[in-house]
């Protein structure tokens, strides 16, 4: 955020520039066992959308990008094996992101169809269903911490 403000101010004074902030499809749903990550990505999305509005007409383009699972080192160390086909190639995500930026979009969703479903479906379902499904998914990745028993 500090870097965006510092460089954004210089871009405004020059009357030109562009900012792409990396959010995630996780910005659209609560993720038990990854709560801080999902909340941070929601912040990045909302920060970027608000900043895009504030800087509109001042020569600085702002876009948030919300990819899904991408073939990077992010998932190293999870205790379950992730299917190879479950990830978008990083090159594809970058290419689609830059195309969206060229098209002057304020938010980009560069992933496959399942990423679009993961972004839009939680807006339609009851929240308890969304949280339960997300908890199941993060638990299967080995991210769940055992609950302490009351006794």
Residue locations for each model-derived region?
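Active-site helix of classical SDR
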Residues: 4, 40
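A short helix-coil junction within the Rossmann-fold of NAD(P)-dependent oxidoreductases
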Residues: 6-15
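Active-site-adjacent segment of SDR/Rossmann-fold oxidoreductases
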Residues: 10-11, 29, 50-61
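Hydrophobic structural elements of the Rossmann-like NAD(P)H-binding subdomain
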Residues: 20, 62-65, 75
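Residue(s) in the substrate-gating loop at a strand-loop-helix junction
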Residues: 24
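Active-site loop immediately N-terminal to the catalytic Tyr-X3-Lys motif
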Residues: 31-35
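C-terminal helical subdomain
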Residues: 64, 81-119
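Short, flexible catalytic-loop segment of classical short-chain dehydrogenase/reductase
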Residues: 67-77, 81
């Amino acid at each position: 955020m500090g870097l965006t403000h510092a460089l954004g101010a210089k871009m405004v004074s020059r009357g030109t520039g562009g900012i792409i902030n990396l959010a995630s499809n996780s910005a659209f749903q609560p993720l038990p066992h990854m709560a801080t990550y999902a909340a941070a990505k929601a912040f990045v999305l909302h920060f970027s959308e608000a900043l895009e509005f504030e800087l509109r007409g001042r020569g600085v383009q702002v876009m948030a990008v919300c990819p899904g699972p991408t073939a990077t080192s992010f998932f190293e160390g999870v205790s379950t094996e992730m299917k190879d086909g479950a990830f978008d190639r990083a090159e594809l995500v970058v290419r689609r992101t830059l195309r969206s930026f060229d098209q002057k979009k304020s938010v980009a969703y560069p992933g496959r169809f399942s990423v679009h479903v993961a972004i839009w479906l939680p807006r339609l379902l009851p929240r308890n269903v969304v949280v339960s499904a997300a908890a199941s998914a993060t638990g299967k990745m080995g991210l769940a911490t055992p609950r302490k028993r009351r006794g």
